[in-house]
């Protein structure tokens, strides 16, 4: 596993029905799970959450720190494979979920739960997420108080919402409510909020998953109820290519690759279909 990134292992673990359901692959799946657990960051004093990067998971071999997107992928894999260690001696070797929650909120623009100096209560940012503590892919901006804030953006905010779901935070938790409010206030299908067309289809993909998992049927946007399932479905129909595929004109994060983006589309539509 050391030759693979934590991201690759997480995707393979959660995506392989054989690993999850077929007992012939249990040992391999448990080893993959244990590797992901071993990648949880613990800087500073060991077994204490005393650093903003503590509790998260990164690529494992690309750069030496955690980030929210890799943490989401790992949490998803660990959540759906948790039955592999239930009622076994390995149950005590699980992820430190409390530390994971601490890391997630350390990526959230929510001063009530995140005391880092960049966290902003300006409505333009409050409740949304950034990529990792101290860095936003959407850059920075002056908030209403003249302070430099790190800009929340769409796809990573849905990643934060989903991460809270896998950590089993309830819908009425103030951290979940805060990101839901930011996402509702910034709802659009024309762009990935604050990122333009970059990561647009990943934004759709995470949106459908997060809103489905938290059982959200409508969004309130500018005082009006929006049936997000219908709106997202219509946008996918409009953007579909003649050959049935989807593709982003913006190449960032491999979204010019039809197989990847079409997979995002199919999975997103499958979540929409389940909610009908």
What is each stretch, according to the model?
Residues 16-17, 21-34, 38-234, 238, ...:
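An alpha-helical repeat/solenoid feature that recognizes helix-turn-helix modules
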